[in-house]
Regions:
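Amphipathic alpha-helical packing segments from all-alpha helical-bundle domains
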Residues: 63-89, 100-115, 133-148
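An amphipathic alpha-helix adjacent to DNA-recognition modules
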Residues: 1-21, 34-38
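C-terminal peripheral helix-coil segments that are non-catalytic and often amphipathic
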Residues: 115-173
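Helical hydrophobic small-molecule/effector-binding pocket
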Residues: 31-55, 73-81
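Secondary-structure edge/capping motif, primarily at the C-terminal ends of alpha-helices
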Residues: 20-24, 51-58, 86-90, 117-124
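Short, hydrophobic secondary-structure boundary micro-motifs
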Residues: 52-55, 67, 95, 158-159
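Non-transmembrane, amphipathic alpha-helical segments
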Residues: 25, 32, 36, 60-67, ...
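Alpha-helical bundle regulatory/interaction domains
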Residues: 8, 33-36, 41, 118, ...
Length: 173
């Protein structure tokens, strides 16, 4: 069973690496940032069993835990660097420490969003699968963490894009 879990986790990591451009010289614009959030949630949807049962999987398979932690730390470092680049360009207002804290909070929400949504479902509902609305709301939550740090037109555009991820009835409340 461990071989199967580790093979699936490797596919998950490969999919995330492709989305995040790990090891590639991607430009680091605001558009890259929201697209990164969106595509990361698509990968999470494809491999939701990992996120939904993360604590249990990591407890049962210590090698998985080690690899997940390394991947998480790498992601936080890359996002923190992305935020510092945006800050240097004047698009984002954050110190190095705030950029690191923002990256950590993004990782926290992204990693555990499915757990929260599953807990919020009524007992006995189709909690095994997370729908597109739940993932869209996760994208919105992450983008809402980033938006206050943005400046000027960049902030307003990011906010407009973020609102598109809200369910129809919630958009104008």
């Amino acid at each position: 069973k461990e071989d199967i879990v580790m093979a699936l986790f490797e596919r998950y990591q490969d999919a995330l690496a492709e989305v995040t451009g790990e090891g590639q010289g991607h430009t680091q614009s605001i558009d890259d940032l929201w697209l990164l959030v969106h595509l990361s949630f698509e990968v999470i949807q494809d491999y939701q069993f990992i996120h939904r049962d993360l604590s249990e999987l990591c407890a049962a398979f210590p090698p998985l835990r080690r690899r997940f932690v390394r991947g998480l730390e790498s992601g936080v470092s890359r996002l923190s660097a992305h935020c510092r680049t945006l800050a240097a360009a004047g698009s984002l207002d954050a110190t190095h420490e705030e950029a690191r804290a923002l990256a950590t909070n993004v990782a926290l929400v992204t990693t555990y969003w499915l757990n929260l949504r599953t807990l919020q479902r009524p007992t006995g509902s189709a909690a095994a699968m997370v729908d597109d609305d739940a993932l869209s709301q996760g994208v919105f939550q992450v983008m809402s963490l980033i938006t206050p740090y943005l400046r000027g037109e960049t902030q307003e555009e990011f906010r407009r894009v973020a609102r598109r991820y809200l369910p129809q009835g919630v958009r104008h409340c």
